[in-house]
Amino acid sequence: MVRPALILVDQRMSMFYGTRLNMKSVTAAEIAALAAWRILGAGDRVGGLVLSDAGFEAVPARRSRAAVLRLLERVAQANAALSAEAPAAPDAAFRLDAALARASGIVTHDWLVLVVSDFDGAGETTLRHLSGISRRNDVIMALVHDPSAHEIPETGRIVVGDGVLQVELDLADSRVRRNLAATGGDRLRRLIAWQAPLDAAILPVSAGEPTVPQLLRLFGAPPRRRSA
């Protein structure tokens, strides 16, 4: 059955972070590109919402290369606008909910909705929007995370903040390490708890590893053999 797809790609400042290989924003862009071309190759229509701290931009679903290129161009523009010197958006954490509300007004029934995000700021409102979407559509949540969320070094100091308020944390303090690890783990646990009521798939993708092999593993594809 041919059906349309909507890809929501998160390019907020929370995605502008990476300790190994990629920024989360880059991994999200790669996931979106791979998904868009695969969906188009199956003969389906592809559209999207590109989310940034400034808001979001919609790309209507079309069955054409031009539509995919337009979506990926918007993603590239949002990615290029990310900067450590960019001013903080106080309501950035709520932008995901606003984009999901817009998605609810776009999809009707029998759509595939792929949300590619670190789910920063996700809460009960997020779940409510996803529940409404999932009633008549298929939802996939691609959780993009950085290895540092689970691999906290035992020494050193890091500065964390939102661009306005900053604080230095001592990693030698076991309480600090536990809290940092819990932050990354809590998002995954929250999505797992949502999986059953949403009847949705969860794809945890690390920005610290190449994207394609991870997606192949998650979808159960056998590894390609090298030619002799």
Where do the PLM segments sit?
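Exposed, interaction-prone extracellular/peripheral surfaces
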Residues: M1-E30, W37-A228
